[in-house]
């Protein structure tokens, strides 16, 4: 007999339409409304990348691809998909309540972020656990999946494909910048989070398996809290690497993200490219995983290792 289980896919969320931007931003800021200037800045960024972020559609596609792959991988389990978002509807709590209404008593949870930190993945899991406890739903959490061979294979392939576009004699003048979303330094230290080490490990695995010679680790998209965040920032890092090594080609792999969205399309494709243009270097940024079978397969393999 087939066992019915929930698959709770959790993600950050993004505004669906312009009128969502203010409540979305207010939720990110724990209920504190943004100033007109801050709101306009965010609207300008969305406008710059061609309108609202494609994240919402991509998140849906990733969740659909994952539940489909899982149902093929497990002959004796039927997974039903639930989407829970951090900062916009359907919220994580709504998804767990819907599970209960559908009679689901057990579920696997996955956050669309490959590295673990208590600030990101841990906070999603906590919200899901608190809601699930009301209904007696048992949750099994995927903590991370950056070590999965298919995840590393995806990025290794992308790095090698990008290198193939660069003349071989310039490979020695090419650097790979591996990055993830910066987080408050104090929180990482206080919780002894493995987050920075997990990014370093990702970079090492990519370097070992790809043809890249030079590699550097950076952080991006830090918040404006007035407290120190993990660094160096990718823009500062780019200038620093150029000053020290005169690299001609910069390849950016924001491996902490899983699709094209504001942080990649603006913070990398605009802000980092501006720096590259300024120093006279070439900017490269391979395609993000989105629904690539290797990426979806990496999450399936991680689930198989814990369930």
Swiss-Prot record:
Name of the molecule in the record: Coproporphyrin III ferrochelatase
Function: Involved in coproporphyrin-dependent heme b biosynthesis. Catalyzes the insertion of ferrous iron into coproporphyrin III to form Fe-coproporphyrin III.
InterPro entries: Ferrochelatase, Ferrochelatase_AS, Ferrochelatase_C, Ferrochelatase_N
Gene Ontology BP terms: heme biosynthetic process
Family: Belongs to the ferrochelatase family.
MF terms in GO: ferrochelatase activity; metal ion binding
Pathway stated in the Swiss-Prot or TrEMBL entry: Porphyrin-containing compound metabolism; protoheme biosynthesis
CDD domains with a match to the protein in the record: Ferrochelatase_C (cd00419), Ferrochelatase_N (cd03411)
UniProt binding sites for Fe-coproporphyrin III: 12, 29, 45-46, 53, 124
Pfam families referenced in this protein's UniProt entry, alphabetically: Ferrochelatase
SUPFAM superfamilies for the chain: Chelatase
EC code(s) of this entry: 4.99.1.9
Residues engaged in binding Fe(2+): 181, 263
Keywords: Cytoplasm, Heme biosynthesis, Iron, Lyase, Metal-binding, Porphyrin biosynthesis
UniProt xrefs under HAMAP family: Ferrochelatase (MF_00323)
Location(s), subcellular: Cytoplasm
Annotated catalysed reactions: Fe-coproporphyrin III + 2 H(+) = coproporphyrin III + Fe(2+)
Keyword Secreted appears in the UniProt entry: no
Entry's Gene Ontology cellular component terms: cytoplasm
